[in-house]
Amino acid sequence: MNENFHSFHEKELRDGQVESVSAGSSPPCDKDSSALLAFRGISISELKNHSVLQALTAEANAWEPRVVSTEVLQAQEEWEAVESIHPETGSRASMDQPGQLISFSEALQHFQTVDLSSFKKRIQPTIRRTGLAALRHYLFGPPKLHQGLREERDLVLTIAQCGLDSQDPMHGRVLQTIYKKLTGSKFDCALHGDHWEDLGFQGTNPATDLRGAGFLALLHLLYLVMDSKTLLMAREILRLSRHHIQQFPFCLMSVNITRIAIQALREECLSRECNRQQKVIPVVNSFYAATFLRLAHIWRTQHKTISDSGFVLKDLEMSAKKSPRRLLKTLETYLAGVSKGQASLLGTQKCSGPQAPHSKDLTFTGVCDLPSHLSEGTWLI
């Protein structure tokens, strides 16, 4: 009896749904209303797969929206935080669980708590100067870093000596977070594979491209993608890197920017700002982001290509070390504009094209690859 009732009730519902979208038995309505009525019988989980919705939401220029507001990025971060709560306990999932995003502060805390003594032995905190160079630096150079900040500086340089260990869960989570944030993917990816070339590494294993910057290069990328304002900047630079003429390997360029930040720290170019803020790591992070922003501006406005990379980076290094405070002010102005929805590196420029090659096919010259008379051989960390 109950089964007959339920089957009759279900038939009634099905008939009602059919009638509600039937042109012959419903009053005339516009196309939008018809589309809404057609979706009534579809579950929410299935809506994202519906062809009509996919057509409505598809971007005309392929891989991502041109402009994403900081409000949208913040909402995505809040939703990701909700997804990391266990429904049965209400507590956060284990931090070792695959798929968990990792914050910059959590990754940094890992390095603050593990034994790095074997790596610390390798660092050279400051540049050794002799003769007239030492006298000139003493008389006209920047101030010495405060004694209380030197341990923090040494930590930065020590992290730059650490390589990527694919067996370390924390290292894997950093890579996964960078990939997900830059691409918008919700799924884990392999730690080796062609997808890393798509993001601008020159090989399928990111560990092979960290020369001269170590794990600090990945921490800098993590810093860039874990804040909604700098994430917007990172995605714009990524779009520029995929321009059909001006393409460059995004992640490899980022590694070179980290090298510049390391060198600026060792040459004490950032000491004045570190002393003023009484911090080292936030200053180095901001200097990295500001330098990357400056590079993107030069690259776009001066129509640079991959063949210009080495000389652009060398000129950028010299100007950044000469006026770090001005560079940091530029970043502050840009991020303030992002908050108001008024800042954009690219505007309406179309940056992707079908002819853009993989990073491994580009001949990229980094700072370390310049002739010795240009690079001055100062890249020992």
Swiss-Prot record:
Which cellular compartments is it found in? Cell projection, Stereocilium; Cell projection, Kinocilium; Cytoplasm, Cytoskeleton
Instruction: List S-S links within the chain.
Output: none
Any keyword Cytoplasm? yes
Keyword Cytoplasm assigned to the entry: answer is yes
One cellular-component annotation, GO: cytoplasm
Q: Which UniProt keyword terms apply here?
A: Cell projection, Cilium, Cytoplasm, Cytoskeleton, GTPase activation
List each copy of the ELMO domain by range. Answer: 170-324
| Chief location of this protein within or outside the cell | other
Name the Pfam families on file: ELMO_CED12
- Entry-linked InterPro entries: ELMO_dom, ELMO_domain-containing
Q: Where is the composition biased (Basic and acidic residues)?
A: 1-17
Q: Where is this region: Disordered?
A: 1-31
Functional description taken from the UniProt entry: Acts as a GTPase-activating protein (GAP) for ARL2 with low specific activity.
What is the name listed in the Swiss-Prot or TrEMBL entry for this protein?
Answer: ELMO domain-containing protein 3
Organism this protein belongs to: Bos taurus
- Gene it is expressed from: ELMOD3
